[in-house]
Every structure is written in structure tokens, then in C-alpha cells.
């Protein structure tokens, strides 16, 4: 017949016998994590601002400066960004659905594969921006500047496409795409 294993005794009255072992293990894990943090093995904060994947849903980002930032896969769904500066920013794969970015600066920004349906881009500047594969149905580009922008494979409402074609010109400096051809202008 097998002998039962010894159960550790607790020094605390009424404590479960395994509680002391769990506390000791938690203490060791905490010490290890603190040691790694102090040694710099675990990065707590990046050296440069990195906002990739941040959720700005339903926030007011008016006049905020995001120029040159990595905002890939970030959500600005329902956000307001009047006169916000996104010049040179990487917004690849971001979500701007139902947002309002009137007079925003997107010069030279990467907006590839962005979901931007039902967005107000009135008066926004897309000079030299890459908008390949965007879904922009129901959006307004009234008065937007699209010189040197690349709209290859973009899904736009026919009304917006025609309006953008009236002002479109140039060649995108990054992709080499002709703006008028990328919009499917006649």
C-alpha cells in the first residue's frame, strides 16, 4: 500500500497548505521580472514615439501633430481630426471609418489599404500620398488636393472620382503612378 505524501504545513493559521508555496513562487517571478526590467531586457517605452495599433476611436484629434509617425493599423474610427497633421505618417491598414478630417494634412502619407468609408476629407491635402487599395465609399473629398497622389485599386464613389479627376495631376514620387491614371480618369 502506498504511503500518502507529506503535505506542507503552513505557518499562517487557517491558510491553505499550498498558499505559502504559491506566495514564494509569485515572489520569485516578480523578482525575475523586476531584474529583467532593470537590466533593460524588457523594453518599457520605445525611444521614439510609436503609436502603431493605438485606438483613437471616437476621440477628438483636431490640430494634433502626427507627422512622420508610425500609425499602421491604428483606429481613428469616428474620430475628428480637423486640421490634424499626418504628413509623412504611416497609416497603412488604419481604420478611419465615419471620421471627420476636414483640412487635414496627409501630404506624403502612406494610406495604403486604409478603410476610410463615410469620412469627411473636405479640403484635406493628399499631395504625394499613397492611397492604394483604400475603401472610401461614401466619403467626401470636396476641395481635397490630390496632386501626385496614387489611388491605384482604390474604391471611390463615382461622384468623388469624377470630382477628383477635375483637379488630379502629377505622378506619385514613391510609387511612380500617374495620379489621373490611378483614379481611372478619362
Locations of the language-model features?
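Bacterial N-terminal signal peptides that target proteins for export
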Residues: 10-33
Amino acid at each position: 500500500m502506498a504511503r500518502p505524501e507529506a503535505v506542507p504545513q503552513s505557518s499562517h493559521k487557517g491558510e491553505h497548505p499550498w498558499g505559502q508555496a504559491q506566495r514564494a513562487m509569485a515572489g520569485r517571478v516578480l523578482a525575475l521580472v523586476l531584474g529583467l526590467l532593470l537590466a533593460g531586457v524588457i523594453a518599457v517605452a520605445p525611444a521614439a514615439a510609436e503609436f502603431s495599433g493605438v485606438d483613437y476611436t471616437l476621440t477628438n484629434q483636431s490640430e494634433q501633430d502626427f507627422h512622420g509617425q508610425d500609425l499602421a493599423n491604428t483606429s481613428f474610427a469616428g474620430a475628428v481630426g480637423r486640421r490634424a497633421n499626418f504628413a509623412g505618417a504611416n497609416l497603412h491598414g488604419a481604420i478611419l471609418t465615419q471620421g471627420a478630417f476636414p483640412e487635414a494634412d496627409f501630404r506624403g502619407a502612406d494610406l495604403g489599404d486604409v478603410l476610410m468609408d463615410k469620412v469627411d476629407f473636405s479640403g484635406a491635402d493628399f499631395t504625394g500620398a499613397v492611397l492604394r487599395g483604400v475603401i472610401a465609399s461614401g466619403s467626401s473629398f470636396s476641395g481635397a488636393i490630390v496632386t501626385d497622389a496614387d489611388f491605384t485599386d482604390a474604391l471611390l464613389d463615382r461622384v468623388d472620382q469624377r470630382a477628383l479627376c477635375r483637379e488630379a495631376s502629377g505622378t506619385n514620387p514613391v510609387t511612380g503612378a500617374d495620379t489621373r491614371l490611378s483614379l481611372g480618369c478619362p
